[in-house]
UniProtKB/Swiss-Prot annotation:
Molecular function per GO: carbohydrate binding
Post-translational modification: A minor form with some unmodified Ser-68 and partial phosphorylation of Ser-66 may also occur.
Keyword line: Disulfide bond, Extracellular matrix, Lectin, Phosphoprotein, Secreted
Modified residues (Phosphoserine): S62, S68
InterPro entries: C-type_lectin-like, C-type_lectin-like/link_sf, C-type_lectin/snaclec_domain, CTDL_fold
GO cellular component annotations of the record: extracellular region
Chief location: secreted
Keyword Transferase: no
Organism: Dromaius novaehollandiae
Name of the protein in question: Dromaiocalcin-2
């Protein structure tokens, strides 16, 4: 029954639908792109290990990453987490930050955005320049 409500090509998991977009955009443009897809659609927020694993599986089967030779070409993938002006990490969909999988314990000193780290097979998050262009994941609740 989870399938109901997901747009064709999107992956259902635990009441949400996930879509991977290979086009490379800055964090802000990626978030705007997601929002244009639907009222409740944003860059993905991740709240537990199971959700994170589901996203990793989706990326593993997504076109740009299915061929290991191509992996370096695309690199990291944007998620909806960024350092706000108040110096707090916040999800773009407004949900609570209640889970983390940071690549290293570096707290950035300036505005920054989080991406899934490709060298860690997307199992960890790293801090990136928000202006960097990367593929991204959008999500919405069903």
């Amino acid at each position: 029954e989870e399938e109901i409500g997901c747009t064709s090509g999107w992956v259902p998991f635990d009441g949400r639908c996930y879509g991977f977009f290979p086009q490379e955009l800055s964090w802000r443009r990626a978030e705007s792109f997601c929002q244009r897809l639907g009222a409740r659609t944003h860059l993905v927020s991740i709240h537990n290990e199971e959700e994170h694993q589901a996203i990793i599986s989706m990326l593993a089967s997504s076109q740009p990453y299915s061929d290991s030779e191509e992996q370096e070409a695309n690199g990291d993938v944007w998620i909806g987490l960024r350092l706000s002006l108040r110096r707090l990490w916040e999800w773009s969909d407004g949900t609570k930050l209640d889970y983390g999988s940071w690549y290293r314990d570096v707290l950035p000193r300036r505005r920054a955005c989080a991406a899934l780290e490709d060298t860690a097979d997307f199992a960890s998050w790293d801090v990136e320049l928000c202006s960097d262009r990367k593929p991204f994941i959008c999500a919405y609740r069903t």
